[in-house]
Amino acid sequence: MSSQYERELRHVLAGIPDGVEKVIRSCTVDEKERMRMVLKRPFLVVRAAGSGIEGSGDLLALRGDICFPIEVKTTRARKLYLSGRTLDQYNALVYEGERCGLMPLYAHRLKGVRGDSWRIFRVETTTLSGSLGVLARRIPSLPRTRNGRAFIDWEQGMPLNEFIQIVCQQDPSSPTLGFL
């Protein structure tokens, strides 16, 4: 994982105007509008210490209403099969998600694509409640091979602009995701 792309995602989720504008240059007008929603409801995004080890993910996105550990992957290939170290990272994310009631995410950036090149996937956990439980139903989980092993398929992920639209919607009656 290149820190350049990790930084790119960090700047978008943190609502840094220059970072958002850089990422949306080749997006459609609708995608740009959705991505800019993060400017009004940004996250505090920190790089996780020991990134990728013990289920921490690469980034931790925090806001008063939600929190996500995010594992960032960047490839030229549309599919990434998890094995070895990447499978260990996945298993650790599942464990920590279950243990702490979190919804870990994978963010996959496909190199060489115009428009929204990021896709978001959810790591399946069973301990989600409240607004995270509702949100989980809207975000696709990692697909499975015929043997049942999780893998990343860029085509099956949620575009980042749609993810931002969901988590950054403003409901005047509630500062949380209760409106989902």
Segments and roles (model prediction):
Residues 1-50:
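Acidic-basic catalytic patches of nuclease active cores, encompassing PD-(D/E)XK
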Residues 13, 59-61, 65-76:
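Conserved catalytic cores of phosphodiester-cleaving nucleases, focusing on short active-site segments
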Residues 41-44, 72-79:
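Short, basic, glycine/proline-bearing loop/turn elements
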Residues 50, 73-75, 109:
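Histidine- and/or cysteine-centered catalytic micro-motif in compact active-site loops
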Residues 55:
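Beta-rich catalytic cores
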Residues 75-99:
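Mg2+/Mn2+-dependent nuclease catalytic core
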Residues 94-128:
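Nucleic-acid nuclease catalytic cores
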Residues 117-180:
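Intrinsically disordered, low-complexity terminal regions enriched in charged/polar residues
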